[in-house]
Amino acid sequence: MKNNPKVSVIIPTIGRESLIRTLESVLNQKYQNLEIIITDDTKEGKAKPLIERYLTDPRIKYVINTKYKHGPSGNKNNGLDNITGEYFTIVDDDDIIMPNAIEELLNVAIKGNYSIVLANCVDNIEGKFTGLQYGKDEEVFWVDVFCGGYDGEYFGITKTSILENNRFNDECWGGEGILWFRLWKRARVGFYIHKALRVYSIDNQDKVSFQYIKKVKRTYLNYVLFLKEFEEDLKNYCPRSFIRLSLIGIYFSVLAGEYKQAFKMCIASVKIYPELFFMPILWTLFCMILPKSFVIQFYEKYSKRFKKVLKQFLLGGRSK
């Protein structure tokens, strides 16, 4: 590996004006051997007028997503198809990265021969860390990431060679964890830098997390596919995580009208962790018996607290 490898920076966009600020934060990187791929998920090329004046920079490539299903996963796939760098990263079009972000991540990747290096982020409202952290730089093992030891929003780079032909599932809405965990499993070990290298926007109503009700069928599919692919790993390394994910999956299954799938998740959770049989059973009954509007209102009001309690109760500490 050469000492100045090219890093491909994918900026998926729907043509929001915040794209300009995001792009400038990438252009202002101390590390300059970059390939910047702006992938536009609008049919009319809404982003192009915003970035027209930047296209004279030979490092910038503007591409419209016509190959994949429209949505965050498909648009990122369009970016992945166009990368030529030895490493790649993804920056959403409403976030900004620190001037030293890519340089610091890349230095650690090269020095330690890591395929994945990540750092924390801070939110744009209170400036708080968005990713779970332990107050220090450290090696990260894939099982700890998989079992929730590193949970939240991070910013990192990944060696392109471990990606191969893997892509996000564009039938899903969000659900990017399937690919990332697949890559972590392949890498086995990475490294965490304990500092914020990205400002993560949490107040944007266009974010994927704010649109799950509109895309409930595609959101439900995330959990079905994730539990199917990683069921054995969950059983072996963190069976309580299976329950946590199933509870959320049950909710989306009911909203999508996939009641058989909700029962399947409930039964699987009971079999995998019978000591906590009451949790999936009660939650399934709650979601199915009560009016859907009430269930949605309850989940939206308490989902953050609900997920936090689940993580604390079911996950506990990390594995190492």
Where are the language model's segments positioned?
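Short aromatic/hydrophobic "clamp" motif used to bind/position activated sugar donors
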Residues: 88
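Short beta-strand/loop segment that forms part of the nucleotide-sugar
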Residues: 33-43, 63-65
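A conserved acidic beta->alpha catalytic loop
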Residues: 25, 39-50, 69, 92
